[in-house]
Amino acid sequence: MDKSKRLFLKPKRSLRRRLPPIGSGDRIDYRNMSLISRFISEQGKILSRRVNRLTLKQQRLITIAIKQARILSSLPFLNNERQFEKNELVARTTGLRTRKK
């Protein structure tokens, strides 16, 4: 190969495989809160499969487990902690406004 053609070749990067977020020994169950909480956003939403890097089967099982935990009141449907913090900081006036005549 000529030197002029070699300039355009990109150096190969080594690909490092990421470890799967769910190990082979982890049981996907609605009672396993430490596992389930990793796949929920701060707002309480189920994260997508692409974000979680799960297989299709694992994502289905995680989704079912999260929904079961929500129904059994182990998990909240919404996480409103941020809204409560904002409401506490904002001072609201409860008095009536007087009109100038």
UniProtKB/Swiss-Prot annotation:
<keyword id="KW-0934">Plastid</keyword>
<dbReference type="InterPro" id="IPR001648">
    <property type="entry name" value="Ribosomal_bS18"/>
</dbReference>
<dbReference type="GO" id="GO:0005763">
    <property type="term" value="C:mitochondrial small ribosomal subunit"/>
</dbReference>
<keyword id="KW-0699">rRNA-binding</keyword>
<keyword id="KW-0694">RNA-binding</keyword>
<comment type="subunit">
    <text>Part of the 30S ribosomal subunit.</text>
</comment>
<dbReference type="GO" id="GO:0009507">
    <property type="term" value="C:chloroplast"/>
</dbReference>
<dbReference type="Pfam" id="PF01084">
    <property type="entry name" value="Ribosomal_S18"/>
</dbReference>
<protein>
    <recommendedName>
        <fullName>Small ribosomal subunit protein bS18c</fullName>
    </recommendedName>
</protein>
<dbReference type="GO" id="GO:0003735">
    <property type="term" value="F:structural constituent of ribosome"/>
</dbReference>
<keyword id="KW-0689">Ribosomal protein</keyword>
<dbReference type="InterPro" id="IPR036870">
    <property type="entry name" value="Ribosomal_bS18_sf"/>
</dbReference>
<dbReference type="GO" id="GO:0006412">
    <property type="term" value="P:translation"/>
</dbReference>
<dbReference type="GO" id="GO:0070181">
    <property type="term" value="F:small ribosomal subunit rRNA binding"/>
</dbReference>
<comment type="similarity">
    <text>Belongs to the bacterial ribosomal protein bS18 family.</text>
</comment>
<keyword id="KW-0687">Ribonucleoprotein</keyword>
<keyword id="KW-0150">Chloroplast</keyword>
<dbReference type="InterPro" id="IPR018275">
    <property type="entry name" value="Ribosomal_bS18_CS"/>
</dbReference>
